[in-house]
A protein has these predicted regions:
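DNA polymerase processivity clamps
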Residues: 1-98, 114-150
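Charge-dense, extended regions
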Residues: 94, 103-104
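Flexible glycine-rich active-site/ligand-binding loops centered on an Asp-His dyad
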Residues: 104-106, 115
Length: 150
């Protein structure tokens, strides 16, 4: 199995929220929650991709897992039937990445039911990266979104 760019991008984004993640949730959702449980993110990647995770599994250090994937030019993932690890290979080199028990991870167990949105807007990854760069430069962690009055 190969991971789509969309999934890799979602996982890279979610690692900034929490290094723990559980994958293989029904419906193709990828969800993450901060360790303080004050921030939650959810991405529905299944309709865009031609596969389903074979089973639910946990990753303790998502950054490490992504770094392992990045060691290969075009990695292929083969999930073990014992549900304990995935083999990552490029046809020449391979290694096993062992899963974590989902019960010890800080992961969302259910969705938060929110009332209808008061506001909605689109923020591209380029715009978000620009905001993160500005935030790091100015040493601030606050962001304000305001309606432009013309």
């Amino acid at each position: 199995m190969k991971l789509s760019n969309e999934i890799i991008e979602a996982l890279n984004n979610f690692q900034t929220i929490n290094s723990n993640i559980a994958l293989g949730e029904e419906g193709g959702f990828i969800r993450s929650m901060s360790t303080s449980k004050t921030l939650m993110a959810k991405a529905n990647v299944e309709p865009e991709t031609p596969y389903v995770w074979p089973y639910a599994f946990g990753i303790y250090d998502l950054g490490e897992f992504l770094a392992c994937l990045n060691m290969f030019e075009d990695p292929t993932l083969s999930f073990d039937e014992s549900e304990k690890f995935v083999t990552i290979t490029d046809g020449i080199t391979q290694f096993k990445y062992f899963f974590s028990d989902i019960d010890i991870l800080t992961v969302p167990t259910k969705d938060i039911d929110l009332p209808c949105a008061d506001i909605q807007f689109t923020l591209t990854s380029d715009q978000l990266n620009q905001l993160r760069k500005a935030s790091a430069t100015l040493k601030t962690n606050h962001l304000s979104v305001r309606k432009s009055v013309t």
